[in-house]
Design a protein with these regions (language model features):
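Catalytic glycan-binding domains that act on GlcNAc-containing polysaccharides
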Residues: 1-149
Length: 149
């Protein structure tokens, strides 16, 4: 029952950003799968996505980063296959989660520094703090918090 409650609550929170119910559920399942696969908290990954792309699948930054997790195309040569599409949901999430895990490993679990590396702003507090706030304020989940609503 916990998984059903979690999915319903996360779906409710995402409804304005991803209006299509099926697309929203696929997004949530995919984030959960890829984050868990990389040893990350799915709620953290949703916070990062909120900050990076605003949940826009086809977002492209001025630097050329692509998709939900704003993955730079050079990563395809480093960890992927030449025909990988960074706008594909699972591909983008797999890359983004793998990259964040890589940076967490380099930084020996220091999330602040790993987020700085992910964003290319290592040593600056703004980006890691914004992601943490999105994670904690928008995407944290506990049954006790739901009971208070």
């Amino acid at each position: 029952m916990d998984a059903i409650d979690w999915l319903a609550e996360m779906s409710r929170r995402l409804e304005k950003r991803i209006p299509d119910r099926e697309a929203r559920f696929e997004f949530l399942r995919s984030v959960h799968y890829e984050a868990t696969r990389a040893g990350l908290d799915p709620q953290l990954v949703r916070g990062l996505i909120q900050v990076e792309s605003g949940f826009k699948k086809y977002a492209v930054s001025t630097a050329g980063a692509r998709g939900f997790m704003q993955v730079m195309p050079f990563w395809i040569k480093v960890v992927g296959l030449s025909d990988d599409n960074l706008f594909h949901l699972r591909t983008n999430l797999r890359y983004g989660c793998t990259i964040l895990r890589h940076y967490l490993d380099i930084e020996r679990g220091d999330l602040f520094r790993a987020l700085g590396r992910y964003n290319g702003s290592l040593g600056q507090a703004e980006y890691p703090n914004i992601v943490r706030m999105a994670w904690q304020n928008q995407w944290s989940y506990s049954k006790s918090k739901l009971a208070l609503r």
